UniProtKB/Swiss-Prot annotation:
Catalyzes the decarboxylation of four acetate groups of uroporphyrinogen-III to yield coproporphyrinogen-III. It is found in: Cytoplasm. Its main location: cytoplasm. Keywords: Cytoplasm, Decarboxylase, Lyase, Porphyrin biosynthesis. Gene3D superfamilies: 3.20.20.210. PROSITE patterns: UROD_1, UROD_2. The keyword Nucleotide-binding does not apply. The record marks 78 as: Transition state stabilizer. This is Uroporphyrinogen decarboxylase. Disulfide bonds: none annotated. It holds the Pfam family URO-D. Transmembrane segments: none annotated. GO terms for biological process: protoporphyrinogen IX biosynthetic process from glutamate.
Length: 369
């Protein structure tokens, strides 16, 4: 059904296998910084018009790959499709971000929640299959979802938040309601990601965008535990091929030792984390060792080309000597930003970044000889 994969560098790095260069892709690589994305979005009429139309979703997913020699594609969708399928009424006002028509703020609203019928998300799975076919084996396709906690933040707040007052009030005042919501979210996310795998996703990523706003104990109880609940239900392989699982908690650097215990292959890091320390903590050989993904500050892309190249080299050098032994697994890095790319990024800066990652990571391997 799908063409054989020509560039498996990303998947190999996820599995801590040696590669001839460090693979690179970018969070939000299909997005508003690209003029061709804006043109397609204008045709679609709205963000959800874009995300729910298979042809448009396929078109925008492939746009960055037409421009740049990236090593992976990521499904064009939104982390909030699952609560939308629960009936919360997702919409996107231009320039305002996501909003739910019916937020979940009391016991009655929580009691109404249930794992949605995955047929309501058929448009996502159709897009996955369409994109995988359109890729023609060029690079792997990553599927994704928001984490149970991050979904809960939006579901309770009704939109993005500066202080997370409403969701944290529920967490502290009615932890029973929060646990109930998170359990439903976790089971829904697991079903959703497994359906993406069935449809053709070759890796899946959980975005815990708001895990970092929690106090230490609350992070472990309300975020990490439910991310683990998702992972425990995910398919390890599909048709005999391993499906790597990636977890990214923005602001989660202080919890790497706890996150090392997660049943996943890759941990994403934001730009505040020292890669060498992260590698020593979770990336070296031993039980539960993880591949690491990250972690350039997205704002580096507003600098001049020479500075971008220098910062890329600094991130690669910080990770340390690349793993080159083809006979065994070892510490690997997937290059990415430490958060999503800014919509104001000059597109030519991304070209500089991708080429710099490939060139410098190859030269590091040559030096090791």
């Amino acid at each position: 059904m799908f063409a054989p994969l020509q560039n498996d560098t990303f998947l190999r790095a996820c599995l801590r296998q040696a590669t001839d260069h460090t693979p690179v892709w970018l969070m939000r690589q299909a997005g508003r910084y690209l003029p061709e994305y804006k043109a397609t979005r204008a045709k679609a009429g709205s963000f959800m018009g874009l995300a729910t139309n298979t042809d448009y979703a396929t078109e925008v997913t492939l746009q960055p790959l037409e421009r740049y020699p990236l090593d992976a594609a990521i499904l064009f969708s939104d982390i909030l499709t699952v609560p939308d399928a629960m009936g919360l009424g997702l919409s996107f006002a231009l320039g305002e971000g996501p909003r739910f028509a019916t937020p979940v703020r009391d016991e009655a609203a929580v009691n109404k929640l249930e794992v949605p019928d995955m047929n309501k998300l058929r448009y996502v799975f159709d897009a996955v299959t369409s994109i995988r076919k359109a890729l023609g084996g060029r690079v792997p396709l990553i599927g994704f979802s928001g984490s149970p906690w991050t979904l809960a933040c939006y579901m309770v707040e009704g939109s993005g938040s500066d202080d997370y007052r409403l969701v944290k009030t529920m967490l502290y005042q009615r932890p029973d309601l929060m646990h109930k919501m998170l359990a439903i979210n976790a089971d829904a996310v697991a079903l959703y990601l497994n359906a993406q795998i069935e449809a053709g996703a070759q890796a899946v990523m959980i975005f815990d965008s708001w895990g970092g706003v929690l106090a230490d104990a609350a992070f472990h109880t309300f975020s990490l535990a439910y991310t683990a609940r998702v992972l425990s239900q995910l398919k390890r392989e599909h048709k005999g091929v391993t499906i790597p699982r990636l977890v990214f908690t923005k602001g989660g650097g202080q919890w790497l030792e706890s996150m090392k215990q997660l049943d996943c292959e890759v941990l994403g890091l934001d730009w505040t984390v020292n890669l060498a320390k992260a590698r020593a903590l979770v990336g070296e050989n031993g039980p539960n060792a993880k591949a690491l993904q990250g972690n350039l500050d997205p704002n580096v892309l507003f600098a001049n080309p020479a500075q971008i190249e220098a910062e890329v080299a600094a991130v690669l050098n910080s990770f340390g000597a690349p793993h080159t032994d083809l006979t065994q697994t070892g510490p690997t890095q997937i290059f990415n930003l430490g958060h999503g790319i800014s919509q104001h990024t000059p597109p030519e800066s991304v070209e500089v970044l991708v080429r710099a990652v490939h060139a410098h990571s190859r030269s590091l391997r040559k030096q090791q000889g």
